[in-house]
């Protein structure tokens, strides 16, 4: 009969997220992980497999809380508010990150995804989910007449995703709200539909 685990799996996985997030995949050793998680190396292997398997679990945990839960929470807001709140939370997270760890997703995209086809697929699934969220908000905003009709909805969503990733990279160098919000103001201005009666032809 298998012995019950002598640790809280959610708690130690969160510790693994913090360890990988702070140091990256390559620089993090199994010894580092075991020390951060408060378990032995043997317990780590028995519970989670090797370092690569644990990294994927940590990545999935981060994505669930940092991306999918946020999308679900913002989905039913008015479309412009949903988009702006998504970005505002990213700016706030950057401001509250004195270690300048950046975004685990972006870090993984740069470090592992180019060299690991399987993991690249996981990253693309997350990026696609974010772009789909932005596309839904653009389409809803156009139906309400509050989002510009310039450009295909998926291309506008791709622009928003690109700006988001750039914002997260820049935040590792300069997370000041002044700089980050300064990047976003013209983006949001481009996103808004022109006022009615300005001579713009209807769609």
Could you tell me what each predicted segment is?
Residues 12-20, 90, 164:
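Short hydrophobic clusters on alpha-helical segments that form packing/core surfaces
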